[in-house]
A protein has these predicted regions:
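Hydrophobic alpha-helical connector segments
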Residues: 1-40, 90
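Short linear capping/connector segments at secondary-structure termini
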Residues: 3-8, 44-46, 109-114
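Amphipathic alpha-helical segments used for helix-helix packing
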Residues: 18, 35-64, 104-109
Length: 149
């Protein structure tokens, strides 16, 4: 999907929302179409939340080319964001995606909202809107540490 987004952009700057959709849609589509959605969700949860260094190293190795392609796309879509901010915002984006994939049922149990009734496309659009706002948020300077008396 990222190649399609690049082709559609042509000579124009790649849009952040197009990059986010290219990242989210295949993952949420796979979850929605997987006959055993629970297994897929557990795999995502384990990869993201498991503190197993070997598993994380394996997944980074498997996904290295995808990570590089999306890193370049985010850099292109957000040229003014420095590496540290990009890393943090990407970290928050990945957390929001993983939480949504693994815990959408919590929303239903707390609020009665049937997230499955809307289809994955609506969930993806909400996640795109939310994470795009986070990526575009003003860069804050950390508060200065006060000397203790």
């Amino acid at each position: 999907m990222l190649a399609e987004a690049r082709a559609k952009a042509g000579k124009r700057k790649l849009k952040l929302e197009a990059v986010l959709e290219s990242l989210f849609v295949p993952v949420f589509r796979a979850q929605a179409s997987h006959k055993s959605g629970g297994s897929f969700t557990r795999l995502i949860g384990r990869v993201v939340f498991d503190r197993n260094a070997e598993l994380q190293k394996f997944m980074v190795g498997e996904l290295a080319q995808v990570i590089i392609q999306f890193s370049r796309a985010f850099d292109e879509a957000l040229p003014g964001l420095d590496n540290t901010e990009m890393d943090w915002r990407s970290h928050f984006m990945a957390g929001a995606m993983a939480h949504t994939l693994c815990n959408a049922d919590l929303l239903a149990s707390f609020t009665g909202t049937d997230v499955g009734a809307e289809g994955y496309e609506t969930t993806v659009q909400r996640l795109v809107d939310f994470t795009a706002a986070g990526f575009r948020a003003k860069v804050s300077t950390p508060p200065k540490k006060q000397k203790s008396s």
